Amino acid sequence: MTDAYSNAGFDTGEIGYGERLAILVVDFQLGCTDPKYPLGRLPMVHKAVENTARLLKVARSKNVPVAKSYTAYGSRQDMPYWKVKPLIDDFIYGHPSTELNPLIHDPDYDFTFCKSAPSIFFNSPLTTYLFRQGVDTVIITGCTTSGCVRASIVDAFSHGLRVIVPEECTGDAEEEPHRINLRDCGRRYADITTLESVINYLETL
C-alpha cells in the first residue's frame, strides 16, 4: 500500500472471521470457464476454478454452507445494458453456457441460483439464504475479479457481512485488474488472503 493510502488511514487491520461462514461462488458457469466459449478462455479463471474446487471439498466436509450463482436471462429484453457481446449472445436460460462447471458443482449440497446483475446479492435469494443459515462471514470466490466479484464484495460489505477473499480463487482476463481490484478492496471492504490460509481455518471447524 502506498504512503498516501497509509497516511490517510486505509487498511487499519484484519476484519477476521465471525461465528458462522459460507462460501460464495460467483459465475463459475461454462460460459466463463469452458474454452469453447469466448469468455471461457482465461487461464487465470481456469486456475481459480481448480483452486475453488479444493476449497469447496474442505468446506463441504465441514458442513459449511455453499451458495453458487450463474448469470442468465429470458431474452435480451430483460438484460441490463451489458457491453460484453458473448454474454449478450449466449447467457440465455437453457443455453449450455449457463450450466455450472462440474468441478465446483454439487447439486445435492449447494444452494444454486440465477442472478441478473454483476453482484451475487442484487435481486437474488442469497440474502435470505444467508440469514436462515445464520451466516455473518462470507468467503467470496469466482469471476471476474474486476467485475462480478468486486461488485459482490462491495454488496457483502454493505449487508454488514465480514468478507474474506482467497486471491487464488478469483480470476480475471489480465493480472493487473485482478491485482489492483483485490488490493483496493483489501484497503476498504475485505480481508484478502490465501487459499491455504482459508483451508487451514476451515480445518479447525
Predicted regions and their residues:
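Active-site acidic carboxylates
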Residues: 1-106, 202-205
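Glycine-centered short loops/turns at secondary-structure junctions
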Residues: 61-64, 134, 160
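Internal catalytic-core helix/loop-beta-alpha segment
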Residues: 94-143
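A short glycine-rich beta-strand->turn/loop micro-motif centered on a GG-aromatic cluster
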Residues: 139-142, 162-175
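Short glycine/serine/threonine-rich phosphate/pyrophosphate-binding segments
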Residues: 145-152
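Active-site-proximal loop->helix
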Residues: 173-186
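A charged, well-structured terminal subsegment
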Residues: 189-205
